[in-house]
């Protein structure tokens, strides 16, 4: 397994605990019976994998057991792993768009790790050899980060119209031939109508001023908020088209099951996971490795 998965096992977070619980349940059984199924179901639900997702995992597992005539509990683990990997794997859409120019809108509620994610994403794009510019309405943190990392930050004063910031950032990115423009957005979900109008306006500005640019809209969700992250995915998904999810704060949480739920319930690929505070701690989401982490591989 790669570095990111060892990060999880070091932390003994969600992965270690769920892995232990699953193997305890399976190893305690001499045969594959209804009691084993009930215990597995309970284990998944208590690991913050939602009820609906758990039901679809269990349904798939029962079919798999029947079709493959599985009678040994040890083989149940492999079947379970395949089913869970299938749920979170969205194929090619898992990758960040590699085209240039690219405009990335980053949305999510304040405090969920949005600003940090933007900084880490900019760092990642630069490491991949792409030129980067940031557009931010007020984030002082981003300005400091940009100065440290030699990335241009186009900003307006606190409370400025985000669309005006996007407009200026686009003009600057076009003039400099920048590969990737990453734009922050306001993080208020309280007033959905305002948020919707704001995002629509930003999208209209990009459509009009930068029609040749490829687009990504990334939703940042804090894994430690558990079920709240699911409702945020729903709310933001109703407001705008989301091309991918960034799941942050996965290093110290027992709530990692939320990744499985979000990937299953919404047709949105998880593109990145945040596994620490460091600049390198934004990892591409690799379904096999992520689920492998649960099964301690």
Give each language-model segment a name.
Residues 16-174, 178-183:
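Primarily NTPase-proximal linker/entry elements flanking Walker-type ATP/GTP-binding cores
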Residues 10, 21, 75, 289-290:
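Exposed alpha-helical structural elements
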Residues 2-3, 21, 27, 91, ...:
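Residue-level signal for pocket-adjacent positions within structured domains
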Residues 141, 162-176, 190-296:
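Conserved catalytic-core segment of NTP-binding enzymes
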Residues 1-20:
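N-terminal accessory targeting/assembly segments
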């Amino acid at each position: 397994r790669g570095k990111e998965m060892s990060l999880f096992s070091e932390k003994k977070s969600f992965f270690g605990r769920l892995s232990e619980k699953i193997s305890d349940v399976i190893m305690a059984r001499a045969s594959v019976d209804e009691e084993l199924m009930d215990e597995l179901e309970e284990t998944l639900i208590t690991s913050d994998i939602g009820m609906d997702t758990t039901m679809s995992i269990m349904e798939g597992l029962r079919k798999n057991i029947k079709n493959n005539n599985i009678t040994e509990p040890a083989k149940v683990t492999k079947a379970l792993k395949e089913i869970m990997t299938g749920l979170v794997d969205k194929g090619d859409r898992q990758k960040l768009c590699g085209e240039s120019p690219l405009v990335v809108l980053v949305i999510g509620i304040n405090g969920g790790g949005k600003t940090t994610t933007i900084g880490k994403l900019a760092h990642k794009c630069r490491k991949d050899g792409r030129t980067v510019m940031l557009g931010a309405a007020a984030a002082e943190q981003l300005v400091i980060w940009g100065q440290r990392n030699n990335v241009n930050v186009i900003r307006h004063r606190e409370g400025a119209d985000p669309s005006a910031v996007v407009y200026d950032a686009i003009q600057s990115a076009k003039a400099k031939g920048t590969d990737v423009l990453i734009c922050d957005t306001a993080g208020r979900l309280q007033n959905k109508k305002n948020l919707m109008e704001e995002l629509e306006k930003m999208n209209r500005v990009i459509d009009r001023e930068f029609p040749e640019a490829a687009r990504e809209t990334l939703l940042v969700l804090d894994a430690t908020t558990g079920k709240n992250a699911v409702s945020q995915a729903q709310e933001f998904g109703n407001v705008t088209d989301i091309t991918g999810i960034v799941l942050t704060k996965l290093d110290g949480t027992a709530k990692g099951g939320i990744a499985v739920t979000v990937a299953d319930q919404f047709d949105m690929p998880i593109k990145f996971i945040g596994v620490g505070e460091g600049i390198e701690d934004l990892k591409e989401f690799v379904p096999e490795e992520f689920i492998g982490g649960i099964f301690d591989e």
